């Protein structure tokens, strides 16, 4: 299954929900999560012995897990692909740019009466071209990598909160702030259908310790990456816990995938063999770069 088919899948669920449950008070809520630079070899649900992802494993066990999900080998094409449901042949413009005039899945949800939010990595707007979260159909946003924010995505994060850039203090961790924002959005909209799009900044480099790392000063890239994957799993768990607490879990579709494979600077266990990651800043297309979780 490719990333654009993921879009088609959950839009089909939306349309089915609209027609079948039109007379009912509840439509399905949707939480769509896209992790950043992590291949399927990094998940214990896929058999990894190096990584621990218990919350995602539980999602896979309770729902569906796909063995063959393939992304594009670079992040922007995957993001454009996912948000429009179209092959990049038809609408890819350039790295870090979303094509103006292309409708996104957020617009389809808004047309069905959904509240919409995006929180995480944007990277679809430059000072010259692209679109903002609002232009993409999101009512609310808390995003990094948009004109006005600085380069800090983890500690001391620089994030745009609903149009205002906030440079957080050194004790703040970006992924925690973003998860907090989405949880607040869910709580605010608990009585109406909502779409929460969560393009995570984890576990993209720089590979630094997380708030849950045993060694807060670690310089070991692989060790820190493993911790970042664990924190990614923790953030997903926090979102699900909020849904459970609010009594919304059974009425919420959660989808988790990734934009591309693991960073090529890392050597990891690839189901019995040691291989470098293959996030394709090179042209060597391989399963390590294209195979992602779903």
What are these regions (language model features)?
Residues 2-5, 10, 19-283:
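Formylglycine-dependent sulfatase
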Residues 281-294:
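Single conserved hydrophobic/aromatic residue that forms the stacking wall/gate
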């Amino acid at each position: 299954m490719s990333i654009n088919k993921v879009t088609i899948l959950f839009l089909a669920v939306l349309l089915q929900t609209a027609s079948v449950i039109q007379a009912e008070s509840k439509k399905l809520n949707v939480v769509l999560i896209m992790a950043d630079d992590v291949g399927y070899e990094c998940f214990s649900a896929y058999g990894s012995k190096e990584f621990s992802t218990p919350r995602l494993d539980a999602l896979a066990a309770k729902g569906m897990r796909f063995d063959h999900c393939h992304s594009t080998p670079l992040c922007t094409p995957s993001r454009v692909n996912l948000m429009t449901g179209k092959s990049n042949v038809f609408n890819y413009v350039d790295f870090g740019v979303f094509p103006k005039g292309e409708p996104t899945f957020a617009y389809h949800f808004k047309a069905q009466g959904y509240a919409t939010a995006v929180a995480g990595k944007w990277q679809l707007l430059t000072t010259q071209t692209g679109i903002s979260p609002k232009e993409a159909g999101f009512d609310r946003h808390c995003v990094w990598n948009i004109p006005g924010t600085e380069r800090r995505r983890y500690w001391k994060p620089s994030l745009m909160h609903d149009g205002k850039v906030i440079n957080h203090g050194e004790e703040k961790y970006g992924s925690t702030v973003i998860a907090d924002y989405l949880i607040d959005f869910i709580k605010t909209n608990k009585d109406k259908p909502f779409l929460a799009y969560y393009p995570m900044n984890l576990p993209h480099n720089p590979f630094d310790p997380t708030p849950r790392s045993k060694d807060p000063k670690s310089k070991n890239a692989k060790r820190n990456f493993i911790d970042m994957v664990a924190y990614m799993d923790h953030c997903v768990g926090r979102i699900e816990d909020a849904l459970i607490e609010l009594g919304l879990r059974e009425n919420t579709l959660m989808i988790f995938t990734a934009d591309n494979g693991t960073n090529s600077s890392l050597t990891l266990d690839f189901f019995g063999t040691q291989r470098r990651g293959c996030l394709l800043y090179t042209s060597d297309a391989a399963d390590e770069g294209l195979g992602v979780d779903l």
